[in-house]
A protein has these predicted regions:
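Sec-dependent signal peptide recognition
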Residues: 1-6
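C-terminal motif of bacterial Sec signal peptides marking the signal peptidase cleavage site
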Residues: 11-12
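Sequence/structural signature of beta-propeller domains
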Residues: 15-231
Length: 231
């Protein structure tokens, strides 16, 4: 299934984008502290935000209030190979150790952390159908992901598709400790690679963020709204 979308752009530098379909107004902005300088995932709930840092950093979940202050740090008995996303439900945190820009990982992981006992961690090991780490070209393959969201009973992973630009959506089975993923839906027409996703409960649609870059190191970010019709 190919999804429809509405595109909003936050543009910068010299990267060319298609004309946006809607405007975007920022009402509130929160500055994260320096210890989250390499933040790669963010999940928001009523009482505050939770975040984490990118690959190689200490395996911590940071609890942050809406003034941008860290109120708690939770260390996990894990290794941060390449953490890229965090989402949650009332019972669990889900940490996506799925970064694979260079395409050299044969398998990636999602850690399911009990919110009431963070020492209770279950790891889901994932392989992508068709992935061959020996033949992937760095930054030119589709077996990478940086966006994840938990919606109802579904844990959804969105690809960072360097090669085709077509975003693949995977439904992760939490009951299977080892599984091979094939996409059940895709999104065409996004102007760049996807790095974040959340679900807008009020509007009943997905909100996707990402960026486009050029060979000269220029970056421009985008935000897109996507129908949930594929669920």
């Amino acid at each position: 299934m190919v999804l429809s979308l509405a595109l909003l752009l936050i543009t910068a530098c010299a990267v060319n984008y298609p004309t946006p379909l809607a405007s975007l107004k920022i009402n509130t902005m929160v500055t994260l502290p320096d210890e989250l300088a390499e933040t790669s995932g963010l999940f928001c709930e009523e009482e505050g935000m939770v975040s984490l840092n990118d690959s190689g950093n200490t395996p911590l979940i940071f609890h942050v209030n809406y003034q941008g202050e860290v109120t708690k740090r939770t260390r996990l008995a894990l290794t941060n190979k390449d953490w890229e996303a965090i989402t949650a439900d009332p019972d669990f945190y889900y940490i996506a150790d799925v970064g694979n820009n260079k395409g050299k990982r044969e398998q990636v992981e999602i850690h399911k952390v009990n919110r009431r006992n963070v020492n209770d961690i279950k790891t889901i090991t994932l392989k992508y159908a068709g992935n061959n780490a020996d033949s992937n070209i760095p930054y030119a393959h589709d077996f990478d992901s940086e966006a994840m969201v938990k919606l109802d009973n579904k844990l959804l992973l969105f690809s960072k598709s360097w090669r085709t630009g077509i975003t693949h959506i995977y439904d992760v089975n939490e009951a299977e400790p080892l599984q091979t993923l094939s996409p059940f839906a895709s999104i065409e027409g996004l102007p760049g690679v996807v790095t974040g996703v959340d679900f807008d409960e009020l509007q009943q649609r997905f909100v996707i963020t990402g960026y486009k870059s050029d060979p000269f190191g220029n970056f421009a970010t985008f935000l897109a709204q996507v129908s949930k019709a594929f669920l």
